[in-house]
Amino acid sequence: FCLVGSEMCIRDSTTAVPFLTISPDSRSGAMGDVGAATSPDVHSIHWNSAKLAFLPSGGSFSISYTPWLSKLVPDISLSHITGYYKLNEISAVAAGMRYFSLGNIQFTNDQGEYLGEYDPNEYVFDLAYSMKLSDNFSAGLVMKYIYSNLTGGIFVEGLQTEAGKSFAVDLGTYYQSKTFEISGYDSQWALGLNISNIGSK
C-alpha cells in the first residue's frame, strides 16, 4: 500500500530595491538591458565588472540622468555617476553611485487621514576590482552598500518605519576572443557571466 501526496504553495514574491535592475546607461537600455558580454565601457561596473580589465589604459567617467516613467509621474528619476581607472595592463578599479528619487508622496492611513509628505529615495554605492587571469579571460568583484528610505520615518500603527540598509556583491567573469577577420573587418566574440546583488534582502 502506497500513499503519495503533494502540496503546492503559491506566494507572492516581493523584490527589494528593484531600482537596482534599471539600466543606468542608454546603450544597454536600447539593447534590451543586455551588458554581461557586450564590449567593455565605463558602465561595465553595473553589467559585468570583469570587463573593466579589458578597457584602455588610463581612466574615464560618466554621468547620466534618466527620467523614469515620466508619462505617469513627472518627478521620478535615476541619476548615475561612475568611473574607472586602470592600475596596470591586467587590472582596474571602478566606483559608482546610483540615486533613485521617487518624487513627492503624500502618506495616508487606512481611513485616508493625512500622515505627511516625503520624497522617498534609494541609492547604492559600488566599488569594483577587475583582473585579467589570462590574455582573454578576466574576473571581477563589486561590493555594494544599498540604502532605501521609502517612508521617511512615519509612524504606522504606533511603530516608526526605518530605512533599509544592506550590503551586496556582484561576481563576474568575461572571455574575449582574439581578433579575427570577417569580410575584411576585424571581429571578436565574447562570453560573459554576472551574478548580481548577492546579499541580504
Each predicted region: which residue ranges?
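Subset of outer-membrane beta-barrel
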Residues: 6-7, 11-201
